[in-house]
Amino acid sequence: MDLVNDLILRAARGEPTPRPPVWFMRQAGRYQKAYRKLRERYTLPEIVQNPEVCAEVTLLPVKALGVDAAILFADITTPLYGMGVDLSLVENKGPVIHNPVRDEKGVEALRPLVPEEAVPFVLETIRILKRELPVPLIGFAGAPFTLASYLVEGGPSRRFLRVKALMYGEEALWHRLMEKLTEAMARYLRAQAEAGADLLQVFDSWVGALSPADYRRYVKPHMERLFQSLRPVGVPVIHFGVGTMGLLEDMKEAGGDVLGLDHHTPLPWARALLGATPVQGNLDPAVLLAPKGVIRREVQRILKENGGKSGHIFNLGHGIVPETPEENVRYVVELIQEVAA
């Protein structure tokens, strides 16, 4: 289907738009009644590996909310299966790695990712969506550090002690792990763009655990290589992290056309720091649990803080939480659409 709404593509290029485009991280998920009904029939991996069902889930928020972009429904760990990682997605916990990568043997056991063989269902989902979507489709992948944190820790972590111990104690091995993950995610993202994704987002959800000095030494060179490898595909790339206020300058230098801001980052400060670089964000997801008067106030605050500057994509500072009322998400879209009314 031809796009009837390219607002997000224009905003990602820093071009003027009549209003900010709006979409939400985790806009397809457990807060939706229709999604919960599907989950009664399918597990998360079953949805992701069934292109027709996965496309249906991806389309849910486009139809129900009127957002300006769809994001492919998947998990950031999805491509790791194709690298030989034994993992399970545990409800209310997240990915659990049954063969953690903590030594040279574990790193060398990671297979090169061949997307067409390892995740053909992801690429077929994209092709289905491109026939049906009136808005741009965002493909995505986890950033190397965030994926490494899962692989080394064995699952979600609060303190990242194992991953930091490897990083500090075995630097050469750390860089070998990051090189493998960087190459794999570059292939995965390029394959998504070639299948039809209009934009890409790189999620570095846990990189805020690092200091700026550690980011520059242990992560930034790999992110630079990742973004350089994506330039030939010619689609805008969003670079997002959580807790990254102290890393924004380095993240900008590492690459990406748009920088995603979490809700702890003051928007006026970030726009001054980043200059002409487009930004995405940054409503606190918890605001969506509040009364509509509070939601309106906070949405208007963010719009005012942006000051009408080009290159702003309205989003949350992290993903929608499952407890969120659907009508509150729809209300945010209506508030943004009022800007152009």
From Swiss-Prot:
Q: What Gene3D superfamilies does UniProt report for this protein, alphabetically?
A: 3.20.20.210
Q: Which domain of life is it from?
A: Bacteria
Binding annotation for substrate:
26-30, 75, 150, 205, 318
Q: What is its EC number?
A: 4.1.1.37
The protein's UniProt keywords, in alphabetical order, are:
Cytoplasm, Decarboxylase, Lyase, Porphyrin biosynthesis
Catalytic activity reported: uroporphyrinogen III + 4 H(+) = coproporphyrinogen III + 4 CO2
Tell me where it resides: Cytoplasm
SUPFAM superfamilies cross-referenced by the UniProt entry:
UROD/MetE-like (SSF51726)
Which biological process terms from the Gene Ontology are attached to this UniProt entry? protoporphyrinogen IX biosynthetic process
A GO molecular function term, named singly, is: uroporphyrinogen decarboxylase activity
Q: What class of enzyme is it?
A: lyase
- Family annotation (InterPro entries): UROD/MetE-like_sf (IPR038071), Uroporphyrinogen_deCO2ase_HemE (IPR006361), Uroporphyrinogen_deCOase (IPR000257)
Transition state stabilizer (site feature) positions: 75
The protein's annotated pathway:
Porphyrin-containing compound metabolism; protoporphyrin-IX biosynthesis; coproporphyrinogen-III from 5-aminolevulinate: step 4/4
GO cellular component, as recorded: cytosol
Q: What does this protein do?
A: Catalyzes the decarboxylation of four acetate groups of uroporphyrinogen-III to yield coproporphyrinogen-III.
**PANTHER family attached to this UniProt entry:** METHYLTETRAHYDROFOLATE:HOMOCYSTEINE METHYLTRANSFERASE RELATED (PTHR21091), UROPORPHYRINOGEN DECARBOXYLASE (PTHR21091:SF169)
Entry similarity comment: Belongs to the uroporphyrinogen decarboxylase family.
What binding partners and quaternary form does the record give? Answer: Homodimer.
Q: What is this protein called?
A: Uroporphyrinogen decarboxylase
Query: Where does this protein come from, organism-wise?
Result: Thermus thermophilus (strain ATCC 27634 / DSM 579 / HB8)
| Gene from which the chain derives | hemE
